[in-house]
Structures are given as C-alpha cells and as structure tokens.
A protein has these predicted regions:
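Short alpha-helix in the alpha/beta-hydrolase fold that links the catalytic acid
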Residues: 4, 124-134
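Generic structural signal for well-ordered alpha-helices
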Residues: 45-52, 128, 132, 176
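Short beta-strand/loop motif that positions the catalytic acidic residue
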Residues: 108, 114-116
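C-terminal catalytic histidine-bearing segment of alpha/beta-hydrolase fold enzymes
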Residues: 136-183
Length: 183
C-alpha cells in the first residue's frame, strides 16, 4: 500500500495510506488474511472517513475533491468510503467486495472504475454484476473491467505467482486518468 501511495504522489497527487492495522505489518499472504479477517470494519470505515476529511481540509487539495483506491478488502473499503463521504469525487476499487447494503452506491458523488480479476473467488461474477446493476440503477458513471486470465491480486507485483504486468499497467493507467479528470 505504501508503494501505491508513493506511485500516486509521484504522479502529483496528495496521497495518504491510513494504518488500519495500527502498526501490525506482514508480507505473508496467510498472515495478511488473518489480519484482514480480524479487522473491525466499522472502525476501519470511520478511520478512513477521518483520513479523507483530513485530506479534504488541506490547502493543497482545496476544491479538488478526494479520490479513493484500495485492493481486496481495501477495495471494498474504498467503495464504502465513497458511499459515506461526499468529498470522494472518484473511486477505483481493485477486486473489492460491495458495500452493504448495495443501494448505498446511490450516495457516490463521482465516477467509479472497478478492476476485477477473471478468476477470483473473493470478488467473482456475482459481486461484479451486483455492483454494475446498482451503479446503473442509480445513474452513476462507471466502468467495471474484468481482466482476462488474471487472478485475485493481479496488481500486486510482490506476488509473482499472480502478478500480471499488462493488466496491472492498464488498470493503473485507468486509475490515473480517472483521478486526473476528476480531482
């Protein structure tokens, strides 16, 4: 996540990566899964809303709006943040689950680019289709892209077994274009 924040900063965006695990860090996928399952989602959502509020109050973001992106659980949290925080003007979740209830997407104030892996037990076709239906129903500008031949975490270049460079580069280009156009 630090790498993604650094990439965004290198592109000229103010970037903030809140520490939702309060100092607990791991590079092991199994341990990361355990941390994720133990995370208090209500508290995490509140912390993200505070972080977005902090960024929105900074002079270097004044009047521009805030973007949100995240991966896996963070993708779901980014979507939820966009539903709950009107200062979010663009959101780009990667293989995230949907907010609950799904009709919260009616509150989203900007366009959505959602990137998904073709083969993903976490955020599979039912998740993608539900999000597309809800965004369409509520008249929200969106693009939902499924990357053929990819698996969950295809953007993560530290996990060579699932990383797919072409898909990751395409998705990143779409995130940057979304943010440049809307923030």
């Amino acid at each position: 996540i630090k790498d993604v924040a650094t990439r965004l900063a290198a592109e000229g965006f103010a970037a903030l990566a809140p520490d939702l695990y309060h100092g607990k860090v791991t590079k092991e996928p199994d341990e990361a899964g355990k941390l994720m399952m133990a995370l208090d989602m209500t508290r995490a959502s509140k912390e993200l809303a505070k972080a977005a509020g902090y960024l929105a109050a900074q002079p270097y973001t004044a009047g521009r709006g805030i973007g949100a992106t995240g991966f896996c659980m963070g993708g779901g949290l980014a979507l939820t943040l966009a539903c709950d925080s009107p200062q979010i003007k663009a959101v780009a979740p990667f293989y995230g689950v949907n907010p609950s209830p799904i009709d919260k997407v009616a509150n989203i104030q900007g366009p959505v680019f959602a990137a998904y892996a073709e083969h993903d037990a976490w955020a599979g076709p039912a998740v993608r289709e539900e999000l597309a239906r809800a965004l369409t129903q509520h008249g929200k500008q969106h693009e939902i892209k499924v990357y053929p031949g990819t698996e969950h975490a295809f953007f993560n270049d530290t996990r060579r077994e699932v990383y797919r460079e072409a898909a990751a580069k395409d998705a990143w280009g779409k995130v940057l274009a979304l943010f440049r156009e809307n923030l």
